[in-house]
């Protein structure tokens, strides 16, 4: 169903052809192609690594699967630990102009690191409360009415 009322079927067909040409860039031939191989020499170490991964894949061994099955990568704090180790800060960049949206204009408590720290503090307070205030449970004897 068209949202435009055309005077004739010919006008509608012409409009559809024009829309299709606009989508294709006003040409029947696409404007993209696979680029030529680079002229520079190939890094031999990189080529060896790629060939090794291709051999492993042919044997049914997939790098991603091996990583996901590795017990060391099941740590929920792994990303935080790696970011700390490599001194990587939280990404706060954007392609949008700052007058429209400034990603650095948030309060520090909205970022993941601050939220994680806040959660850790809450858990510590709860555990501390449970340790110190629940050392004994006081019972009262029941009294029968007379």
From Swiss-Prot:
Domain of life: Eukaryota
Record-linked InterPro entries: SAP30BP
Basic and acidic residues: bias regions: 21-32
One GO cellular component term: nucleus
Protein keywords: Meiosis, Nucleus
Pfam families with a match to the protein in the record: HCNGP
Localization: Nucleus
Region described as Disordered: spans on this chain: 1-40
Example GO biological process: meiotic cell cycle
Its biological purpose: Has a role in meiosis.
PANTHER family: SAP30-BINDING PROTEIN, TRANSCRIPTIONAL REGULATOR PROTEIN HCNGP
Designated name of the protein: Meiotically up-regulated gene 151 protein
Gene field: mug151
